[in-house]
């Protein structure tokens, strides 16, 4: 069974940077050794945002974006190797999620698309890459997401305490770690995505630092109620979503009914939308004693305070409190999934994704010997 140093690479729907994590992984433990966040150039970020919102582009433009992202991921890995004074031979493999540009797991031909050419990463780092993690699960009738609950269960499940893990990235997803029950998990809806999109358009800021804008505003209750009527929120699990659904266009359609509002009030309403949709799903899933939060949203003091207020009787903490950096959780998960793929072990959980069976995930792009 393969064991040793692995690297995980994650560029999520928030597009707030490429997260790269170095860890030692074997069948008994996952030990994080180092991490860094690598910036995404503004032009590249905008190109991804455009395609995620349905903007048409030529096959040439699509191919160029795929190559550019692959090179970006390789640069991020090489920066971590240099920082840690490591060589390619010191790493077993890279687990690279890629950049999701479309996720449509239902319909006549279900599909998901992550780009960032893994061949570029192999060529530029000299390290074997495991990628394309989601499509096998979809081929077996699953949602292809979320995949991280399996990792959450391996690291954070407790024999007696009812626990849930909440990742608040662009999309928020919940892992249900309830003793005596199959592991559950699904996307609850928007996490940071709409908040980030709004403040970017209104103030040119990539995110609402320390929730300053949202805390200066007041929730627009009619707007909140209008958004909560979206059918996704009442859809039963398994379910998953992404930027192709919850995007700036979705927000604009709701705002048409409420013109002229203070931008800070809209920001406050979007923060409340994220908090309410998450807390409702926690309660509908039976509640928990401890909710452990990771992802960029765990650094949002307003979100954390609202979750605690909406979930009385639940201890709301970050995963940092149990020794796992909330900023690095997803990248670490894909390093772990790469280890499982090379070990020939399944990486999905049918109880989470709805797939017909467990399966080994991903495709392997081997480095030259």
UniProtKB/Swiss-Prot annotation:
What is catalysed by this protein? 1,6-anhydro-N-acetyl-beta-muramate + ATP + H2O = N-acetyl-D-muramate 6-phosphate + ADP + H(+)
EC class (word)? transferase
Keywords, A to Z, come to: ATP-binding, Carbohydrate metabolism, Kinase, Nucleotide-binding, Transferase
- Which positions are annotated as binding ATP? 12-19
First and last residue of the signal peptide: none
> Which Pfam families does the UniProt entry name for this protein?
AnmK
Q: Biological process GO annotation list?
A: 1,6-anhydro-N-acetyl-beta-muramic acid catabolic process; amino sugar metabolic process; peptidoglycan turnover
Q: Name one GO molecular function term.
A: phosphotransferase activity, alcohol group as acceptor
User: Could you confirm whether the keyword Membrane appears in this record?
Assistant: no
> Pathway it belongs to?
Amino-sugar metabolism; 1,6-anhydro-N-acetylmuramate degradation; Cell wall biogenesis; peptidoglycan recycling
Q: Known EC number(s)?
A: 2.7.1.170
Query: Does the entry feature the keyword Nucleotide-binding, yes or no?
Result: yes
Matching InterPro entries, A to Z? Anhydro_N_Ac-Mur_kinase, ATPase_NBD
Name the family: Belongs to the anhydro-N-acetylmuramic acid kinase family.
Free-text function comment from the UniProt entry: Catalyzes the specific phosphorylation of 1,6-anhydro-N-acetylmuramic acid (anhMurNAc) with the simultaneous cleavage of the 1,6-anhydro ring, generating MurNAc-6-P. Is required for the utilization of anhMurNAc either imported from the medium or derived from its own cell wall murein, and thus plays a role in cell wall recycling.
Q: What is this protein called?
A: Anhydro-N-acetylmuramic acid kinase
Question: Could you tell me which species this protein originates from?
Answer: Escherichia coli O6:K15:H31 (strain 536 / UPEC)
């Amino acid at each position: 069974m393969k064991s040793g140093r692995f690297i995980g690479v994650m560029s999520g729907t928030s597009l707030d940077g490429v997260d790269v994590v170095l860890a030692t992984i074997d069948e008994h433990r996952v030990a994080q050794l180092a991490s860094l966040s690598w910036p995404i150039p503004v032009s590249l970020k905008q190109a991804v945002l455009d395609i995620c919102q349905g903007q048409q582009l030529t096959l040439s433009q699509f191919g160029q974006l795929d190559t550019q992202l692959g090179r970006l991921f390789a640069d991020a890995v090489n920066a971590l190797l240099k920082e840690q004074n490591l060589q390619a031979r010191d790493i077993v493999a890279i687990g690279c999620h890629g950049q999701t540009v479309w996720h449509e797991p239902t319909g006549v031909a279900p599909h998901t698309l992550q780009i960032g050419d893994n061949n570029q990463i192999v060529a530029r780092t000299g390290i074997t890459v495991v990628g394309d993690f989601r499509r096998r699960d979809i081929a077996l009738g699953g949602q292809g997401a979320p995949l991280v609950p399996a990792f959450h269960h391996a690291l954070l499940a407790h024999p007696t305490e009812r626990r849930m893990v909440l990742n608040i990235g662009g999309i928020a997803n919940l892992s249900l770690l309830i003793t005596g029950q199959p592991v559950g998990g699904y996307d609850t809806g928007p996490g940071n995505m709409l908040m980030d999109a709004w403040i970017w358009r209104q103030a040119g800021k990539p995110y609402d630092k320390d929730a300053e804008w949202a805390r200066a505003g007041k929730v627009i209750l009619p707007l909140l109620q209008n958004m909560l009527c979206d059918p996704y929120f009442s859809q039963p699990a398994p379910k998953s979503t992404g930027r192709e659904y919850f995007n700036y266009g979705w927000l604009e359609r709701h705002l048409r009914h409420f013109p002229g509002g203070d931008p800070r009030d809209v920001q406050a309403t979007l923060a409340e939308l994220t908090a309410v949709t998450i807390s409702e799903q926690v309660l509908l899933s039976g509640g928990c004693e401890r909710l452990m939060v990771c992802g960029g949203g765990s650094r949002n003091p307003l979100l954390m305070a609202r979750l605690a207020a909406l979930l009385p009787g639940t201890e709301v903490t970050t995963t940092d409190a149990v020794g796992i950096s909330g900023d690095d959780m997803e990248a670490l998960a894909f390093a772990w999934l790469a280890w499982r793929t090379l070990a020939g072990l399944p990486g999905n959980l049918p109880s989470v994704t709805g797939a017909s069976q467990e399966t080994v995930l991903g495709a392997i792009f081997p480095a030259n010997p």
